[in-house]
Amino acid sequence: MKAYEVLYVIRPDLDDEAVAATVDKLSEVVTNNGGADVAIDKWGKRRLAYEVNDYREGFYILMNFNGEARTAQEVERIMKISDAVVRFLTTKKED
């Protein structure tokens, strides 16, 4: 299994419960698709470098996990169709 790192930004107008639900849902997607060792680091609400979808701020979440390529692809697919996620970046960590 490879190590992946996903940094994603959640809409700032969501309440804390909705943010937590989104984080839990994405962690569950990883574990349901063969991923393991999910680590979540919440960076909190920060200002974006530029306006994205009319938002100037967002909740930054860093998620690290081990999994196959299909696991990372499924997480990206879910984030693309999610209304809560404004932006995301997935990188494969070097060994």
Swiss-Prot record:
It holds the Pfam family Ribosomal_S6. It comes from the Bacteria. The keyword Ubl conjugation does not apply. The keyword Ribonucleoprotein applies. GO terms for biological process: translation. InterPro entries: Ribosomal_bS6, Ribosomal_bS6_sf, Ribosomal_S6_plastid/chlpt, Transl_elong_EF1B/ribsomal_bS6. Keywords: Ribonucleoprotein, Ribosomal protein, RNA-binding, rRNA-binding. One of its GO terms (molecular function) is structural constituent of ribosome. GO terms for cellular component: cytoplasm; ribonucleoprotein complex; ribosome. Belongs to the bacterial ribosomal protein bS6 family. Binds together with bS18 to 16S ribosomal RNA. This is Small ribosomal subunit protein bS6. It comes from Desulfitobacterium hafniense (strain Y51).
